[in-house]
Amino acid sequence: MFTNREGCTLYEKTIHNRAPTYIRRELGAVYWEEKQEQNSGADRSPRNEVFVSIPVTSVKGYIPQKDDRIVGEIISDEQPPNTAITIMSVSDFLYGSPSAQHIEVIAK
């Protein structure tokens, strides 16, 4: 599977005492694609998304979930930085050839 980043940092969202807390996790090589669009509606606000394809070999015991945060590089911060983006959807493609198995993430 084609990858273009050596890894990324995932922050698993958990709730502790009614407040969100995060568990830092590192993922191996991923394919990271930023998509920038201009909305054609009246507000003209840009719609920016990031598509991340994570090979099954890069997943280390945890599959990303909706509302987790993700950063496009390996960082050592224990809490997500302001540049972290929120995962909006996760699709798993864990069938077929092992070299083609992957997880697709859309984040904003």
Where are these regions (language model features)?
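Active-site-proximal polar cores
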Residues: 1-26
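Short, conserved turn/kink motifs that form compact alpha/beta structural patches or helix kinks used as
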Residues: 20-108
